[in-house]
């Protein structure tokens, strides 16, 4: 059983690349905005961000372009959809089960501190004694 579990784990973590992804990755090394434009479109947020990165700094534009190609790959989307179909459902509805308040609420900024009520309020400026001249 452990062997089947290991093989299933290896299969889930593998990522195969197709020829379009490979071509866009190579293109991303030389002209990163073109690779992002081919995947996302001309006036998309990622394309404009990559163009800005390309004009200011070349290396981050390459990393961003490779990330966009990886995230939008058809092979990756197929793998993720298959993973979600076989994964057990987890109830993570936080509104249905709100967290209990275990700590007391801190006082608001406009409230006076009752513990230090006998101490006169002072500003943070240094006070010069009136005896000095």
Curated annotation (Swiss-Prot):
Q: Which GO terms describe its molecular function?
A: ubiquitin protein ligase binding
Q: Where is this region: Disordered?
A: 89-133
* TM region positions: 17-37, 49-69
GO CC annotations on file = fungal-type vacuole; fungal-type vacuole lumen; late endosome membrane; membrane
Compositionally skewed regions (Polar residues) per UniProt? 124-133
Q: Pfam families from the entry?
A: Pmp3
Question: Membrane side Cytoplasmic: which residues?
Answer: 1-16, 70-133
Keywords per UniProt: Cytoplasmic vesicle, Endosome, Isopeptide bond, Membrane, Transmembrane, Transmembrane helix, Ubl conjugation, Vacuole
Covalent cross-link Glycyl lysine isopeptide (Lys-Gly) (interchain with G-Cter in ubiquitin), where: 125
Comp. bias (Basic and acidic residues): 90-100
- What does the entry give for GO biological process? endosome transport via multivesicular body sorting pathway; protein catabolic process
- Please indicate the ranges of residues that lie on the Lumenal side: 38-48
The membrane topology term of the UniProt record is: Multi-pass membrane protein
User: What are the subcellular locations of this protein?
Assistant: Membrane; Late endosome membrane; Vacuole lumen; Cytoplasmic vesicle membrane
Q: Which family does it belong to?
A: Belongs to the UPF0057 (PMP3) family.
- Quote additional remarks: Present with 12500 molecules/cell in log phase SD medium.
- Annotated protein name in UniProt: Protein SNA3
Organism source for this protein? Saccharomyces cerevisiae (strain ATCC 204508 / S288c) (Baker's yeast)
Read off the lineage from the record. Answer: Eukaryota, Fungi, Dikarya, Ascomycota, Saccharomycotina
């Amino acid at each position: 059983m452990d062997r089947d579990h290991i093989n299933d784990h290896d299969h889930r973590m593998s990522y195969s690349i197709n020829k379009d992804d490979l071509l866009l990755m190579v293109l991303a090394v030389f002209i990163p905005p073109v690779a992002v434009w081919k995947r996302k479109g001309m006036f998309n947020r990622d394309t404009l961000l990559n163009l800005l990165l390309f004009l200011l700094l070349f290396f981050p534009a390459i990393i961003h372009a490779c990330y966009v190609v990886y995230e939008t790959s058809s092979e990756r989307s197929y793998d993720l959809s298959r993973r979600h179909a076989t994964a057990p459902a987890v109830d993570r509805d936080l509104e249905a089960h709100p967290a209990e308040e275990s700590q007391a609420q801190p006082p608001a900024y406009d409230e006076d501190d009752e513990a230090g009520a006998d101490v006169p309020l002072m500003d943070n400026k240094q006070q010069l004694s009136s005896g000095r001249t």
